[in-house]
Amino acid sequence: MRRRAAVIILIISLLITGLAVASPMEDAAKAYARGDYKTAYRLNKSLAVQGNADAQFNLGIMYDNSQGVPQDYSEAVKWYRKAADQGHAHAQSNLGRMYALGKGVPQDYVLAHMWFNLAISRFTASEQEEREKTGKLRDITASTMTPDQIAEAQKLAREWKPKKEK
């Protein structure tokens, strides 16, 4: 009986005061911000393999920029694609950049244009600056493409559907 009362008091006190427990994603962001890339990588990797698009995007950034891991554009593309496939706008923009530059993938302006279009359509109102930057990248890419290539990229973007990680 005494144990039950203690548990009830503990539950009530936790409900009243709230739990100040940071999420693994918050811990990863804090580690990254302070330059502790090994910890950020470990925490993001754990979440990424579970299908967390933000963590997948973060791993892409880390491989792209050699932060806590050796620079590996193919690995960056792998993680950007996992997040982009789920509709992550920043990952879509970065994946478009990788295709435009041929980093980690064969250069492909049609796919670059497609990913830029998708990102532009998914950025929120508070991400207007990112939308504009991505729009400029798309326009630069389009300037190297034929009208048929642009039409193909637009068709691919229209037909694209997000995938949920399993």
Question: What are these regions, as identified by a protein language model?
Answer:
Residues 24-31, 43-47, 58-65, 94-101, ...:
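Hydrophobic face of amphipathic alpha-helices that form TPR/SEL1-like repeat modules
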Residues 1-9:
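Bacterial N-terminal signal peptides that target proteins for export
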Residues 9-17:
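Bacterial N-terminal signal peptides
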Residues 128-166:
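Terminal, low-structured helical/coil segments at or just beyond the last alpha-helical repeat
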Residues 31-36, 44, 49-52, 65-67, ...:
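Short helix-capping/linker turns of helical repeat alpha-solenoids
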